[in-house]
Amino acid sequence: MSRIGKKPVAIPSGIEVKVDGNVLKFKKGNAQKELDTKNHVDVKVEDGKVEFSPKGEDRQSMAFWGTYRALAHNIVVGLTDGFSKQLEINGVGYKAAMKGKILELTLGYSHLVNYEVPDGIEISVDKNVITIKGTDKQQVGQVAAIIRDFRAPEPYKGKGVKYLEEHIIRKAGKTAKK
């Protein structure tokens, strides 16, 4: 049974929440987010809290109960604080620069790698650190993963794009015969 689903989601001041059928609508200023529960859970908004309850007693309803509660919590955190991920570029000649809405990466290929930044995401570059910010946790993580995949870190010298807190396990190189 879900323990996450039991906890109500606290709504901080400045965020409006409405239930419209199966859709939960969050609004803060001009930013709006929607969560479609697809009729898997019951939603109640009262006393500055959003409470979820399962539609049935089957396993699937219980799984959706915790999932939708976590998604709603992520929307609230995204609208209040936002989410961010940091990537680090390691390697001789490897660099990044923002040119308008395009992230331009030099990663040791014979060509530049250009990545168009999607709406709702802000990217800033400071020396060899790329900072990705946004209100949608899934989108921030997806953009970070896409940028990392352009040149994933290799295990011998550690060259490539890695998450700032990621530890790359290094391998020993070839040893000469004696």
UniProtKB/Swiss-Prot annotation:
Listed SUPFAM superfamilies: Ribosomal protein L6 (SSF56053)
Which GO cellular component terms are attached? Answer: cytosolic large ribosomal subunit
Q: Which GO terms describe its molecular function?
A: rRNA binding; structural constituent of ribosome
Q: What keywords is this UniProt entry annotated with? A: Ribonucleoprotein, Ribosomal protein, RNA-binding, rRNA-binding
Q: Which InterPro entries match?
A: Ribosomal_uL6-like, Ribosomal_uL6-like_a/b-dom_sf, Ribosomal_uL6_a/b-dom, Ribosomal_uL6_bac-type, Ribosomal_uL6_CS
User: Which superkingdom does the taxonomy of this entry point to?
Assistant: Bacteria
Q: Where are the transmembrane segments?
A: none
Offer one example of a GO biological process linked to this entry. Answer: cytoplasmic translation
Q: Does the keyword Disulfide bond apply?
A: no
Per the entry, what this protein does is: This protein binds to the 23S rRNA, and is important in its secondary structure. It is located near the subunit interface in the base of the L7/L12 stalk, and near the tRNA binding site of the peptidyltransferase center.
Assembly and binders: Part of the 50S ribosomal subunit.
Q: Which family does the entry's similarity section mention? A: Belongs to the universal ribosomal protein uL6 family.
Q: What is this protein called?
A: Large ribosomal subunit protein uL6
- Gene for this protein? rplF
